[in-house]
Amino acid sequence: MLLGALFLLAITDSLAQTIPDDNTVAIIRANYLYQFSNYNDWPAENKKGPFVVGVVGNSDVFDIMVSKYASKPIGSQLLKVIGANEVLTAPHVHVLFIDRSKKAELAKYTREFRGVSTLIVTNWEGALAQGAHINFLSIDGSIRFEMNKTGMLESAITPGIKILQWAIQ
């Protein structure tokens, strides 16, 4: 029994060491980006070719998206992750995450993607009022998100039931 407890403690300690604390937030955000891709609905014309997620300003989120989620299916499409240098030249970007380190560029991206079905996700206070559709918040040590449902619908993106339930109301 004692040997089993020591083994469990060693495994738990080993797992804790494989995911650095500073990457935990990036891992959670990447998982949310994948869930947003899976549980929202885009117009039929955006359901051909790869499902593209762009990441601007956060190499940790980008690396995690590439290693864990690239090439996973989103409906009948395969998920493709692109970086900032490809975002404005891609034929279509379904989900765009803009990190707070690039918040000065939000206006440029909202102008570029106006009238296009691109879900814009951010992580700083006040971003919804500046054109973001979903914004990550840290509440009592947990990563949560708020959303602008009207903005999503105006971009022809239908929020899924799970996304609506998970969002802060």
Task: Label every model-predicted segment.
Residues 1-2, 169:
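Absolute protein N-terminus
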